[in-house]
From Swiss-Prot:
Component of the dark-operative protochlorophyllide reductase (DPOR) that uses Mg-ATP and reduced ferredoxin to reduce ring D of protochlorophyllide (Pchlide) to form chlorophyllide a (Chlide). This reaction is light-independent. The L component serves as a unique electron donor to the NB-component of the complex, and binds Mg-ATP. InterPro entries: NifH/chlL_CS (IPR030655), NifH/frxC (IPR000392), P-loop_NTPase (IPR027417), Protochlorophyllide_ATP-bd (IPR005971). Its EC number is 1.3.7.7. It catalyses: chlorophyllide a + oxidized 2[4Fe-4S]-[ferredoxin] + 2 ADP + 2 phosphate = protochlorophyllide a + reduced 2[4Fe-4S]-[ferredoxin] + 2 ATP + 2 H2O. ATP binds at residues 45-50, 74, 215-216. Belongs to the NifH/BchL/ChlL family. It is an enzyme of class 1 (oxidoreductase). This is Light-independent protochlorophyllide reductase iron-sulfur ATP-binding protein.
Amino acid sequence: MNIAIRNPVATRPAERREEGSLQVALDPDLRIDTAKVFAVYGKGGIGKSTTSSNLSVAFSKLGKRVLQIGCDPKHDSTFTLTKRLAPTVIDALEAVKFHAEELRVEDFVVEGYNGVMCVEAGGPPAGTGCGGYVVGQTVKLLKEHHLLEETDVVVFDVLGDVVCGGFASPLQHADRALIVTANDFDSIFAMNRIVAAIHAKAKNYGVRLGGVIANRSAATDEIDRFNAAVGLRRLAHFQDLDVVRRSRLRKATLFEMESSPELDAVLAEYLALAEALWAGVEPLEAEPMRDRDLFEFLGFD
């Protein structure tokens, strides 16, 4: 693993912009100018980690240097890549009594399948502390040591549909936000709230919506209807296949599973998605619905 640590650079204090909420002004020297950065959001349990990990591998199959950052206290974003629960940033910081300058890259960065580099933020014990704070500190640490600059693609796999505080930190650094959803009420309802959060963050940061990834769904009719109504687009569609479940049990990515016609079609879809994202997808200016309007809009089979 050939990643150098440079001296940390301090960020500027928080300042209030004319629009949006209180934001932290990033030092221009800390901006990620050498990589394409994607933040993956979606309802809890929708398959963001599965999607993120296989997308990371797809990018690596295209010859890109990839860093996946798990932003969930469960620290299980990257285990199909690393074949284990990787050490977390918060554990590494605790080991050096939060003297970040004492950390080595190998203390919290693990190389996974096909060279994908993996980082897990970790978090406080269940029911205590603020997971959002931990994610914010992880992003700060990675930027201070310039680790994000050593890659072509950065994939943030973000906790559930929580888009406030530290869990919104990836939006400060992302070029495109991707939303994983299923063709059901709860997933689309959560997607609408995520659209609203990204819309607010886009006032002060460069992040823009990239599109929607349909997952665990035989059909996409409700997703497509919602997309048309608010100004989104579907980038890929992955059905609910048993090979996905088996890959998780084997602690493996889909790219490591035994070939079959249905799996080959899934892998082709991931590679096509990676190619499209690398080539660049047009930013979307989606307008979220009000909750009650969305409630009336969805359903009625």
